[in-house]
Amino acid sequence: MKPKLLFEQLLSRQDLSSDQMQEVIHACMTGEFSDVQIATFLALMRMKSETVNELTAAAKVMRQLAHKIDLGNPLIDIVGTGGDGRNTFNVSTACSFVVAAAGIKVAKHGNRSVSSRSGSADLLEQAGFILNLSDSQVQNCINQCQLAFLFAPHYHPAMQHARAARQQLGIRTLFNLLGPLINPAQVKRQVVGVFSTNWLKTIATVLANLGSERSLVISSQDGLDEISIAAKSEVVEYRDGNFKQWFISPEDYGLKHSSLDAIIVDSPEQSLHLIQSVLSGDSGPARDIVLLNSAAAIYCAKDGISFDASIEEARIAIDSGKANHCFNKLRLLTQTLNKESNHE
């Protein structure tokens, strides 16, 4: 599709067909479009607002172009779109250790920051984790720690063509929405946080279109892309071909309604400090938000468990020291694997 025709169509607020969307995403991901053309496309899509069909088509192209990794099943991913502008610490990354410590295999898909102060990769590198691992090394992490981090640039090399445009735009774009939809381990269960409740049903429907077995798509009424400790959060759950909407408040599960001030960070260093305090068993708002969001993943991963029981499993994973042990064990394992590969 010629860029001029594409831009005219989007300027007139006309949605793209699935075929058109696949063609355009392919052009963005193969260097056919320039940085200016990619940025223009992303900005116009944001103004028009992306549809279920457009996102499904885009995700299919991204999945086709990805370097896939087979880590077996069942697996879960806990991921947010980002773009909420709130600069909270890396909650979903912290939850990954808790959920893995609860005995659930986690394939955490993440990247460096584009629009926030600390992406999951920024935080993990600050903590000393090695992210550039081979497929067999990633499998080793899953086998030994129940958890592996899938560094997006390694699995989505085509994304390099859009990186400059995204960075120069500096705003939330289509790719924030796509990130949670293109886990290279092809997970069938996911907790996905979105930056606005307007996107809940859309993202849940796209996940269903892409073959998800079960998903929870979450947004809080104060604009977080996760379950909040400062407001009610809305959930759209997809399971067995059906969608269900429900709400979560911290008070419903014996947790305090708290200000977000205590969980805002300015850097990966601050985010790491908060995560380590939570995993060490410290109480407070950071622990509470990790409990709530870890519970969402446990609830999504395990059939027949209540949300109350999921909160308790998350609490035990932290207070037993297992989550902290998982953090330290995985960090050491990634360092050891990296040294071994460097000596080969």
Swiss-Prot record:
Catalytic reaction equation(s): N-(5-phospho-beta-D-ribosyl)anthranilate + diphosphate = 5-phospho-alpha-D-ribose 1-diphosphate + anthranilate
Pfam families documented for this protein: Glycos_trans_3N, Glycos_transf_3
UniProt binding sites for anthranilate 1: 80, 111
GO annotation terms (biological process): L-tryptophan biosynthetic process
Residues annotated for Mg(2+) 1 binding in this entry: 92, 226
NCBIfam families: trpD
Gene that encodes the chain: trpD
Keyword Oxidoreductase included in the entry's annotation: no
Family, per entry: Belongs to the anthranilate phosphoribosyltransferase family.
Cofactor annotation remark: Binds 2 magnesium ions per monomer.
GO molecular function, one term: magnesium ion binding
Protein source organism: Legionella pneumophila (strain Corby)
Cofactor names: Mg(2+)
Entry-linked HAMAP family: TrpD
Protein name, UniProt field: Anthranilate phosphoribosyltransferase
Pathway(s) it belongs to: Amino-acid biosynthesis; L-tryptophan biosynthesis; L-tryptophan from chorismate: step 2/5
Gene3D superfamilies: Nucleoside phosphorylase/phosphoribosyltransferase catalytic domain, Transferase, Pyrimidine Nucleoside Phosphorylase, Chain C
Keyword Heme: no
Source species, domain of life: Bacteria
EC identifiers of the protein: 2.4.2.18
Subunit structure and binding partners: Homodimer.
